[in-house]
From Swiss-Prot:
It comes from the Eukaryota. Its main location: cytoplasm. Component of the large ribosomal subunit (LSU). Mature yeast ribosomes consist of a small (40S) and a large (60S) subunit. The 40S small subunit contains 1 molecule of ribosomal RNA (18S rRNA) and at least 33 different proteins. The large 60S subunit contains 3 rRNA molecules (25S, 5.8S and 5S rRNA) and at least 46 different proteins. Belongs to the eukaryotic ribosomal protein eL22 family. GO terms for biological process: cytoplasmic translation. Keywords: Cytoplasm, Nucleus, Phosphoprotein, Ribonucleoprotein, Ribosomal protein. The modification Phosphoserine is found at residues 49-50. GO terms for molecular function: RNA binding; structural constituent of ribosome. PANTHER family: 60S RIBOSOMAL PROTEIN L22, LARGE RIBOSOMAL SUBUNIT PROTEIN EL22A-RELATED. Component of the ribosome, a large ribonucleoprotein complex responsible for the synthesis of proteins in the cell. The small ribosomal subunit (SSU) binds messenger RNAs (mRNAs) and translates the encoded message by selecting cognate aminoacyl-transfer RNA (tRNA) molecules. The large subunit (LSU) contains the ribosomal catalytic site termed the peptidyl transferase center (PTC), which catalyzes the formation of peptide bonds, thereby polymerizing the amino acids delivered by tRNAs into a polypeptide chain. One of its GO terms (cellular component) is cytosol. Pfam families: Ribosomal_L22e. This is Large ribosomal subunit protein eL22.
Length: 117
């Protein structure tokens, strides 16, 4: 049994529209962070043509991988970026559909006790 050498191509989108509109999230810094931190064959800075990180519009990042690449790894790197920039307390990473991740605010419900005081 011989395996065919097929080309795998995955596209992942990270949508940070809400955070960018509130001016608390820098898409350019996040794009640079991903380029610096994504590992290919166990090495950072080894993207080459196998992984392409680009900006789509002013608030979306597209990662196109021509190798086996996990969406969970992208989510992990996004969480690390949020933690590094002290945004993890306000934003979370949610998968809205296959290959699409969105940065959303946590739902904070203020109780009646706090409003009266």
């Amino acid at each position: 049994m011989v395996k065919k050498n097929t080309k795998v191509s995955n596209k992942y989108i990270i949508d940070a529209t809400a955070a960018v509109n509130d001016k608390i999230f820098d898409v350019a810094a996040f794009e640079k962070y991903l380029i610096d931190r994504i590992k290919v064959d166990g090495k950072t800075g080894n993207l080459g043509s196998s992984v392409v990180v680009s900006r789509e519009g002013s608030s979306k990042i597209a990662v196109i991988a021509h190798i086996d690449f996990s969406g969970r790894y992208l989510k992990y790197l996004t969480k690390k970026f949020l933690k590094k920039h002290s945004l993890r307390d306000w934003l979370r990473v949610v998968s809205t559909k296959k290959g699409v991740y969105e940065l959303r605010y946590y739902n904070v419900v203020v109780g009646n006790d706090e409003e009266e005081q």
